[in-house]
Amino acid sequence: MPKCPIPIRISFFSYFLKESRILSSNPVNFSIHLRFSSSVSVSPNPSMEVVENPLEAPISEKMFKSAPKMGSFKLGDSTLSSMIESYANSGDFDSVEKLLSRIRLENRVIIERSFIVVFRAYGKAHLPDKAVDLFHRMVDEFRCKRSVKSFNSVLNVIINEGLYHRGLEFYDYVVNSNMNMNISPNGLSFNLVIKALCKLRFVDRAIEVFRGMPERKCLPDGYTYCTLMDGLCKEERIDEAVLLLDEMQSEGCSPSPVIYNVLIDGLCKKGDLTRVTKLVDNMFLKGCVPNEVTYNTLIHGLCLKGKLDKAVSLLERMVSSKCIPNDVTYGTLINGLVKQRRATDAVRLLSSMEERGYHLNQHIYSVLISGLFKEGKAEEAMSLWRKMAEKGCKPNIVVYSVLVDGLCREGKPNEAKEILNRMIASGCLPNAYTYSSLMKGFFKTGLCEEAVQVWKEMDKTGCSRNKFCYSVLIDGLCGVGRVKEAMMVWSKMLTIGIKPDTVAYSSIIKGLCGIGSMDAALKLYHEMLCQEEPKSQPDVVTYNILLDGLCMQKDISRAVDLLNSMLDRGCDPDVITCNTFLNTLSEKSNSCDKGRSFLEELVVRLLKRQRVSGACTIVEVMLGKYLAPKTSTWAMIVREICKPKKINAAIDKCWRNLCT
């Protein structure tokens, strides 16, 4: 018979049973682990089914507080540890602190495992500071020796919270400081440090730590290699990541599907499908079975390269290998097909998805409907919309907005307005994009008053107007000659604190140019130049509007000055810029020589600034107008293009085009 090291009086058990009857009205399942070879469990009602609630501490502190009145019973250290762990797991940190204070006052001893439980609980509650504070108090206040286990627990809490700099500082303080903590990092410690360094893009420093692990008698594991490969891939250092795979295998560490997925993703983003194929072959040779992440990554890579047919074939292979496609798989494929203007093929894929029992979501429907409208297949888009309703898939704000925008593109704003009304009736409130699309649709069909009415209706649904809404209204009003009203809207926008972007500025400048107010338009242009926001700086559209306005007024001198400013600010002319000046110069002279000379001068100026792309655009315009450049101009173009870097870039572009 096992010997009991602590005498327990019968009076305590009598009290305990009495207490349990009192508590039976509010049943709590608890058990007392005595120092026998087996545990003794006592339940308020033996016939009652045990119900465990992980959010409640399983030990009644009230019971233990009352127990000393009945005899010499004293809580053991193991009981206090259990209570701390219970409070921590239930998130009751106030009780944890109270109990820790009691333990400190009574000079009791708590095992390290209990502290680790509290550290993890602090991590789940996003309280890294409390975890660090308790770690520093372990020895002095609780006489608990810290080991690498508690150190790793706190380090993990800090790094999982995204506090990477703080995590590295904590590591350095514990391991390298003169605090004599006598904690030597292990493999997990190094993995956490490497993770933090890679997240901070200090990949070279992470490699140094990785190379120094054997000196600390720690060998890298699969997680170490995977973390480092991921960091290298994010820095576009794919070759180094692939070399690590070879090194890993030579060290006898078998790569997991996660490692292959990281490398495949990096190679796909680089567009190196040849090496991706070799890597997948290597994966199969090593007996590593691709999972849904592998297939999704490969499909995404094929879609990026425009190889949609191969992506669809890979989907079939995925299904045949009994790997179930998910939302990401189908979403990637359908997005790829729609971007390639193959929405009809995407609809066919949709049918095969349904045959496999896949239930389409709002995202898939919105992408398909948008794609069909952009390809001018409005009837098919509306048919899909009706099918969506038949399938019981409730449209969300994205689906409704896509429908409104698509119908407006087709010149059917009244039908789009009906969709908007149905949207509101269903309890789905339109956003700024929905209203802006409808306003643009009405303006496009000449229904200016209806567009203004939509603007007013935004107040009824409580939709706040953004800079895009104001840009649409200003552009629409200017388009029908109502520039004064547009200026009033502009003033209101500035008054309420909305900073106009390039589109808004360009819209009001276009309106002012349309009524011949060039000075006011140029004043706004100079105001744009003073803006700190890059999104408020003039672009080629802004310059073309101003250049056209100046040329319409025959103010060639100021137009040339503005063109010079455009070039100085790094904005290259486009086809519209060239045509604007060619038309103006042709009106002044029937000869084409002035136009050719003007454009050639532009080409030379751009080439001298190494802006080859802009120069080539102008040359294309010249050739389209049968204005062949001089031999000297061609020579400059060839010399600039044939520089080593330019040749390599051209070759890479050529290969990319061949691959697609």
From Swiss-Prot:
The keyword Iron-sulfur does not apply. It comes from the Eukaryota. Gene3D superfamilies: Tetratricopeptide repeat domain (1.25.40.10). Pfam families: PPR, PPR_1, PPR_2. The keyword Repeat applies. NCBIfam families: PPR. Belongs to the PPR family. P subfamily. May play a role in embryogenesis. This is Pentatricopeptide repeat-containing protein At4g20090. It comes from Arabidopsis thaliana (Mouse-ear cress).
